[in-house]
Amino acid sequence: MLLKGAPAADGILATVKDNIRSQSGSPGLAVVLIGNNPASEIYVNMKVKRARDLGMISRSYRKPSDATLSDILSLIHELNCDENIHGVLVQLPLPKHLDTQTILSSISPNKDVDGLHPVNMGKLLLGETDGFIPCTPSGIVELFKYYEIPLYGKHVVILGRSNIVGKPLSALLMQKHADTNASVTVLHSQSEHLKEITKTADILVSAIGVPLFVTKEMISEKCIVIDVGTSRVPADNPKGYSLVGDVDFNNVVPVCQAITPVPGGVGPMTVAMLMRNTWESFLRHTL
């Protein structure tokens, strides 16, 4: 079974669009891009366009790769104070001379629609419901809901411990809710007995960013595979590259119960949850 993200994402986006039409005023989303990473440029343009298609006010702010920390913090302060902006996100990764956590922590928690501010991460860990949840983890849970895949009591193995996916996803899946309440094991590329552990998973989520890392030998026949990784590998095509995930898709498909494709799986869900978070931030600021 192929778990495509578009059908689930389209439903979320349609609801957001209808909600915006029913309200006076428009949500405002600001996207900050630092440097000239081609992939980041594509992602920023996609997010800005999607927001505008839904009826939001969406602005992109571009800074050169040699921008100073002071420059970035000054811009974020302006956006924090702008009453027409309800969501602020900084596109990652950042140039190496900039401290990611310092910049993310400077965004107002009430406008942190990416859900990466320490306040929002802490609320997630504590099970509080008034913060913003990081978009990829929340998108994965929504994907399970759409395909009616139960998480309650299931063994979920997560490959990867990043602050963007692995850590917040583990906290989200362990919440004592009817839609989650899973038993979670978090591994990484240096974990011992990795293959033996992944084969015990009811659900395997890979988010380590290593192309084709997950092989068929790591999967059981009952397993549902969620591939969060997206990597460019050289290819003989006009672009000169292809997008692949962490999972050796062609060889894993025959041995697993269900799997997300790359591209077209988790990616659309991440964008949809960003739009939902921006809408919810608008409501919190206006009601």
Swiss-Prot record:
It comes from the Bacteria. One of its GO terms (biological process) is L-histidine biosynthetic process. Keywords: Amino-acid biosynthesis, Histidine biosynthesis, Hydrolase, Methionine biosynthesis, Multifunctional enzyme, NADP, One-carbon metabolism, Oxidoreductase, Purine biosynthesis. It catalyses: (6R)-5,10-methylene-5,6,7,8-tetrahydrofolate + NADP(+) = (6R)-5,10-methenyltetrahydrofolate + NADPH; (6R)-5,10-methenyltetrahydrofolate + H2O = (6R)-10-formyltetrahydrofolate + H(+). InterPro entries: Aminoacid_DH-like_N_sf (IPR046346), NAD(P)-bd_dom_sf (IPR036291), THF_DH/CycHdrlase (IPR000672), THF_DH/CycHdrlase_cat_dom (IPR020630), THF_DH/CycHdrlase_CS (IPR020867), THF_DH/CycHdrlase_NAD-bd_dom (IPR020631). Pathway: One-carbon metabolism; tetrahydrofolate interconversion. It holds the Pfam family THF_DHG_CYH. One of its GO terms (cellular component) is cytosol. NADP(+) binds at G160, R161, S162, S189, T230. One of its GO terms (molecular function) is methylenetetrahydrofolate dehydrogenase (NADP+) activity. Its EC number is 1.5.1.5, 3.5.4.9. Belongs to the tetrahydrofolate dehydrogenase/cyclohydrolase family. Homodimer. Catalyzes the oxidation of 5,10-methylenetetrahydrofolate to 5,10-methenyltetrahydrofolate and then the hydrolysis of 5,10-methenyltetrahydrofolate to 10-formyltetrahydrofolate. This is Bifunctional protein FolD. It comes from Chlamydia muridarum (strain MoPn / Nigg). The gene is folD.
